[in-house]
Amino acid sequence: KAHEDELKNHLCMINTDMAGVVIGYDVARVIGTKEATAHCDAFMRRKGYNVGVTQEIYSSDSIPFADKGVPAVNFIRFGHHVGGTFIHCRNDLAKFLSEQSIAKTTQFVLDYGIELIESEVFPFERVVPTEMVEKVDKYLAKKELAEAKKDK
């Protein structure tokens, strides 16, 4: 809340999560309009990056931004448990990561960010559509919290 007034200057939030997994696959989860999703997908295809792009929420640092109306693109490298991803547990070890994998993620995230920054006209609206807002609200349990406050 201390920086809430600064959000008006943010057109999109880019978040990277779980990068570096050796055995895995790259995805982008867009919390934004269908146009924002299509833009990200077209960019990845045009540049030849093998990144699966979908419009859906993702539990990460982008949620507070989306909750305030700032669209977000989450870049994630999901892994497989055989030589892959163990998250927040005793098997969450650096031996399952590689510099090459981190460099690959870094490159397409950087390229995408540059595309947005250098656009003379921003390529999609600064909108989180209603259906995405509802999913974010459900994730944050806003309805349940409001009802709990009423019951007090």
Describe the role of every protein-language-model region.
Residues 1-74, 78, 84:
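Metal-dependent peptidase/peptidase-like ectodomains
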Residues 82-151:
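His/Asp/Glu-rich mid-to-C-terminal helical/loop segments that flank catalytic regions of hydrolases
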